[in-house]
Regions:
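Amphipathic alpha-helical packing segments from all-alpha helical-bundle domains
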Residues: 132-158, 164-168
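Alpha-helical transmembrane segments of multipass membrane proteins
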Residues: 177-178
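Short hydrophobic/aromatic patch on the recognition helix
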Residues: 58-67
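Hydrophobic alpha-helical connector segments
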Residues: 76, 83-124
Length: 225
């Protein structure tokens, strides 16, 4: 995915380990950006790992070391995407429910036109929808995100092993995210502007969370410390 690199500084006080890590990040970003450009030009299924390596000026093994799965060359926000909801719940304020924290986060993501809820541009959106492999990988992302959210909710509510409630809550809360993501991509492919999509999503988010409020409004409220 084409994500702008953060500004790099010429700070000579950076430790050697920091320089190595920065170099790794630059290499990773170069590979991902190069691959995405090739995929946009020729289609996901028509580009090989070897061709990506040549275009990025790295060894084929370097590509697979950074991205063991070809799909992740495109979907390179794995940790942010799958762990984001659990992190929001974990970091919410005292007195705040999981429902309220996630509602605020979804509203902010829609307002900021965040890639995590599907904003990407028409070419990239078509790339996602045209490839069964990418559709399948996105489904895995959604499923993993719900598992991580369920585990966090279970920990927050001191649930017994095998308790079903955290899984149901995670499915409902994660399901809103899945629906928002799919709606954003669909509307983007159809040519709707990001601003218009953002406004529509805001309405959907409020509607969805008002529907969930009676059942989850008092669930997983962060106790005061």
């Amino acid at each position: 995915m084409l994500i702008p690199m953060s500004a790099q500084t010429a700070d000579t006080s950076i430790r050697p380990q920091g320089l190595r890590e920065r170099k790794k990040q630059q290499t990773r970003q170069n590979i991902s950006n190069t691959a995405t450009l090739l995929f946009l030009e020729r289609g996901f299924d028509n580009v090989t790992i070897a061709e990506i390596a040549v275009a990025a000026d790295v060894a084929k093994m370097t590509v697979t070391n950074y991205f063991p799965r070809k799909e992740d060359l495109v979907l390179d926000l794995h940790d942010e995407f799958t762990g984001g909801l659990a992190r929001i719940v974990r970091e919410r304020r005292a007195g705040e429910s999981a429902l309220a924290a996630l509602r605020d986060a979804y509203l902010a993501a829609a307002a900021n036109q965040d890639a995590v809820v599907g904003f990407s541009g028409p070419e990239f959106a078509r790339l996602l929808t045209d490839s069964p492999a990418l559709v399948g990988r996105l489904r895995e992302f959604h499923e993993e995100r719900e598992r991580l959210l369920a585990a966090q909710l279970a920990a927050e509510t001191d649930s017994a092993a095998g308790d079903f409630a955290p899984r149901v809550a995670a499915a409902l809360l994660g399901g809103v995210h899945r629906a928002l993501f799919e709606e954003t991509v669909r509307r983007t492919v159809e040519g709707e502007s990001n601003q218009s999509i953002s406004e529509v999503l805001t309405g959907y988010i409020n509607e969805s969370f008002e529907t969930l409020e009676p059942s989850l409004g008092d669930y997983a409220v962060r106790a005061a410390r």
